[in-house]
Amino acid sequence: MADVEPYTTPAGVEAAIKDAAKKSATTDPSLNTNQRIRGEYFDRFLSRVFSEGEESEWLLKGGTGLLARVPSARATLDIDLYRDGFTLDEALADLRRLASTDLGDHFRFEYAGHEQSIGGEQQPYTDGYAVTFKVFIGGRGKDTIRVDLAVGAGPTDSVTTANPANALDLPRLVRHQYRLFPVADQIAEK
């Protein structure tokens, strides 16, 4: 990505996101302005998770992974992430570390807690937490993001890396490509 001047204030980045979301919703009404703003909050979070590029062992799954491939797919309420090679607690610690990455965009993601969410007899090869982060732009709380974090049985097909198809047109924000859980494996899990 070419060097661009970042937004100088939290209000500036917030206004740019709102304007881009309105324009995008006018062009494609499958998602409304508020859903697109929330999607940008997801992207700000995921740009931190995938900030290590090809070195990353994180994979995006679920509805957010679908939106990254097909921009007019249904809106989703959470982010599904898979981490290879870590225990669940190690993955949680790594997620918290990555969420604190400063991308110069005035966003901050504050860990708010987690609870056991998957595993046990129903899913013996997978362990997971439902993790909550508070979203801040500057010092103002804006939203809450829930992440379904999973470790365990990994994908059997090739991982793809791509820019999110649902991204808003915000060239002054640092964005990192997502590593996407294979579609065939995602379907098999359902």
Annotated model-derived regions:
Residues 1-190:
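Compositionally biased terminal segments of proteins
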